[in-house]
Amino acid sequence: NHILAGLPLYGKKILITAGPTYEAIDPVRFIGNYASGKMGFELAKSAANKGAEVILVSGPTHCKIDSNRVITHAVFTAKEMYNVVHQHFSSVDAAILSAAVADYRPKKTALSKIKKTSESLLLELEKTEDILEKVQELGIEVRHHLYIK
């Protein structure tokens, strides 16, 4: 620990989100995106190398991280990601929300594979949780925002 004590982020806890989230249409199909999670994993690696304890909340990705300073929580949906972020948000010094979270999910998820019975399929969608908006509602002060589009 005496070696880590000289690092700039030693003693800090950072929460980072990474990757996509997927929203099930039925047991074999989902709404998702092509986010790789690479940016979030690189941010986690960098923060850990600078001495931080990192909580990494990742959607489905092939990225891996090998660091005893990173605790990874694998999630699938926007709701699952929100739940883990909510659980840890009040205990961290900083949060970087870099995941590509789905904006919408099917209002109803079919319990079995949807069969091709007609020429078209109509899906009704509803908004997912806005993670940043929801954590701000907890009354936790968010002092600095950096939005990158």
Which residues make up each language-model segment?
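YjeF_N-associated NAD(P)HX repair module
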Residues: 1-15, 106-109
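Glycine-rich phosphate/diphosphate-binding loop of Rossmann-like nucleotide-binding domains
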Residues: 8-77
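Glycine-rich phosphate/dinucleotide-binding loop and adjoining beta-alpha-beta core of small-molecule
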Residues: 48, 53-149
